[in-house]
Amino acid sequence: MKVAIIRFPGTNCEFDTTYAFEKLGVKTQIVWHEEKEFDADLVVLPGGFSYGDYLRCAAIAKLAPAMQGVFNHAKKGGYILGICNGFQILLESGLLKGAMKHNNNLSFISKNQSLRVVSNDNAFLKNFKKDEIINLPIAHGEGNYYADETTLKELQDKDLIILKYEPNPNGSVFDIAGICDENKKIFGLMPHPERACEKVLGNDVGLKMLKGFLLENFINFNF
């Protein structure tokens, strides 16, 4: 299995993400934002502040040449994971539905956050029980997810909401912390699984999440 991690100017979580996957024995490649072609089974858009989040979060990143490769990967049915700023990029580019607003307190929030697993009928959260409570770090200023009523109904009816905040830290509608697309191949979440990979630092629930992609691709590895 190959994981391509896209690096934009301002990305700051690419090395944490690399560490997490390499800890699982997976080959990774950091792809510069100007590269249009890359070979991967899973594409990850990591956290950070792409292009300084000027205009608004992810507004410029969605136009980067590397996004052409991301779109091509999506058309082939490949897996895509967007973490924090990566989730914002998926929303801005239309690969996932909805939008992000500033946190309702207009402040940057950085803390460990309780989350509820809403759906485990997907590769990403298949290793968790439905309604299981987990903890992951969050660090964002624009994590207030928003969608219109029609989109929210679709997300609910099609089981596309994967994670909810417990309790809500930022005003996100329906407490949404993460969603996926209809094919359950494209995932976006604001919390950072790559920052929860060592028990000595708090927990390693992030590894359990990422491991789902490996099992989906029938990878054999040792822990």
From Swiss-Prot:
GO terms for cellular component: cytoplasm. The active site is at C84 (nucleophile), H192, E194. It holds the Pfam family GATase_5. Its EC number is 6.3.5.3, 3.5.1.2. SMART domains: GATase_5 (SM01211). GO terms for molecular function: ATP binding; glutaminase activity; phosphoribosylformylglycinamidine synthase activity. It is found in: Cytoplasm. Gene3D superfamilies: 3.40.50.880. Keywords: ATP-binding, Cytoplasm, Glutamine amidotransferase, Hydrolase, Ligase, Nucleotide-binding, Purine biosynthesis. GO terms for biological process: 'de novo' IMP biosynthetic process. Pathway: Purine metabolism; IMP biosynthesis via de novo pathway; 5-amino-1-(5-phospho-D-ribosyl)imidazole from N(2)-formyl-N(1)-(5-phospho-D-ribosyl)glycinamide: step 1/2. SUPFAM superfamilies: Class I glutamine amidotransferase-like. PROSITE patterns: GATASE_TYPE_1 (PS51273). The keyword Hydrolase applies. It catalyses: N(2)-formyl-N(1)-(5-phospho-beta-D-ribosyl)glycinamide + L-glutamine + ATP + H2O = 2-formamido-N(1)-(5-O-phospho-beta-D-ribosyl)acetamidine + L-glutamate + ADP + phosphate + H(+); L-glutamine + H2O = L-glutamate + NH4(+). Residues 2-223 form the Glutamine amidotransferase type-1 domain. Part of the FGAM synthase complex composed of 1 PurL, 1 PurQ and 2 PurS subunits. HAMAP family: PurQ. Part of the phosphoribosylformylglycinamidine synthase complex involved in the purines biosynthetic pathway. Catalyzes the ATP-dependent conversion of formylglycinamide ribonucleotide (FGAR) and glutamine to yield formylglycinamidine ribonucleotide (FGAM) and glutamate. The FGAM synthase complex is composed of three subunits. PurQ produces an ammonia molecule by converting glutamine to glutamate. PurL transfers the ammonia molecule to FGAR to form FGAM in an ATP-dependent manner. This is Phosphoribosylformylglycinamidine synthase subunit PurQ. It comes from Campylobacter jejuni subsp. jejuni serotype O:2 (strain ATCC 700819 / NCTC 11168).
